[in-house]
Design a protein with these regions (language model features):
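N-terminal, positively charged, Ser/Thr/Ala/Gly-biased leader segments
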Residues: 1-11, 15-22
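Small-residue-rich segments of transmembrane alpha-helices in multi-pass membrane proteins
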Residues: 18-21, 73, 135-151, 200-202
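Alpha-helical transmembrane segments of multipass membrane proteins
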Residues: 21-25, 93-98, 116-124, 144-149
Length: 204
């Protein structure tokens, strides 16, 4: 049970849900339906948990090379790859379907596009370019957009302003982690910014 809970990266998922709730609140302008909030948060939690779990599966070999992640359920051998893959797919499909049925199709589509861009674009790029951090900020900012569309079923200028703010907010967080664990990332072959700029003078 604890290992499966670890797979959804609860700390990251919690931040995703905060962003989703913020998007709902801002879109509702004081008239937020608690049921809409509940369905948006639950559906997003399932998609986010599925994304995190599938990321564990994809990066299981890299995680085994990093001290920070070597004790995760897959590299430590506590769970088998097939179990993790099945769990991740199940969460993702349930989340997408839940959002489509109980929220709206637009929010479901954004959620699934976020999952695909995170796993199929950002994740493999981490081994190829330090610009992966910039690319990863696009799906990273999507939860606030999903919260907005859950209420409005559309994304106007205000929604994109919120998206841009969350997009920009991620960089200090990303860069701080990349700097703190630069040796780990180098060992795993991930091309984070500190590998190109060991003195820490650059933000891009």
């Amino acid at each position: 049970g604890a290992d499966y809970f670890c797979l959804i990266k609860p700390e990251v998922t919690f931040l995703v849900l905060i962003a989703t709730g913020l998007g709902c609140y801002m879109a509702a302008q004081g008239a937020l339906s608690l049921w809409t909030l509940f369905h948006a948060v639950l559906g997003t939690a399932l998609v986010a948990g599925g994304t995190a779990t599938l990321n564990h599966y994809i990066e299981r070999d890299l995680d085994g090379r990093m001290r920070r992640t070597a004790q995760r359920p897959l590299p430590s051998g506590r769970l088998k790859p097939r179990e993790v893959l099945n769990f991740g797919i199940t969460l993702s499909v349930l989340g997408g379907a839940y959002l489509a049925v109980f929220v709206n199709l637009l929010t479901s589509v954004i959620g699934l596009l976020t999952l695909l861009s995170y796993l199929l674009v950002y994740t493999p790029l981490k081994r190829k370019t330090s610009w992966a951090t910039f690319i990863g900020a696009f799906p990273g900012a999507a939860p606030v957009l999903m919260g907005w569309t859950a209420v409005r079923n559309s994304a106007g200028l205000e929604a994109w302003v919120l998206y841009a703010l969350l997009f920009a907010w991620q960089f200090p967080h990303f860069l701080a982690i990349a700097w703190m664990y630069k040796e780990d990332y180098a060992r795993a072959g991930m091309l984070m910014l500190p590998q190109r700029d060991p003195e820490g003078n650059r933000a891009f």
